[in-house]
Amino acid sequence: MSGCGKSEEFGVGPVKEEMKLAPVDAALYTKGELIFTTKCVACHKFGSRLVGPPLKDVTKRRRPEWIMNQILNPLEMTQKDKVSKELFAQYLIQMTFQDVTQDDARALLEYMRAVDEGKLTPKE
């Protein structure tokens, strides 16, 4: 990946430092599951496309910093991040800002990690 700096891998937004992830935290992913069912499920499923892209294995394809920035800063990500621009071109819909805190975004990330690691079945 010569020429790709951390900032490109992290996307555009408040998360600028590399995240050190511990094993999946049950309390955190439980909070994330609740947030997902109230703010994300209208547009996202894990196994198939709904309005937005399917989320299955997103934590294996994208860095945690990128996922956090996409959740926290979707408009600017679509304007400035290469991958987010490609997703916009493919799905023809702008991810909306869901007014989540950085702690909420971290819980959502943990929920996605738990689903991707097979620790729970997604709420869809």
How should each PLM-predicted stretch be described?
Residues 1-3:
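C-terminal motif of bacterial Sec signal peptides marking the signal peptidase cleavage site
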Residues 6-35, 51, 124:
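Electrostatic cytochrome c docking/interface patches
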Residues 19, 45, 85-87:
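Sequence context of c-type cytochrome heme-c attachment sites
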Residues 28, 36-39, 47, 51, ...:
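Short pre-active-site segment immediately N-terminal to redox-active cysteine/selenocysteine motifs
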Residues 29, 33, 45-73:
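Gly/Gly-Pro-rich "capping" loops immediately C-terminal to redox-active cysteine motifs
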Residues 51-58, 75-105, 120, 124:
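Axial heme c-ligation environment in periplasmic c-type cytochrome domains
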Residues 66, 104-107:
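Charged catalytic carboxylate motif
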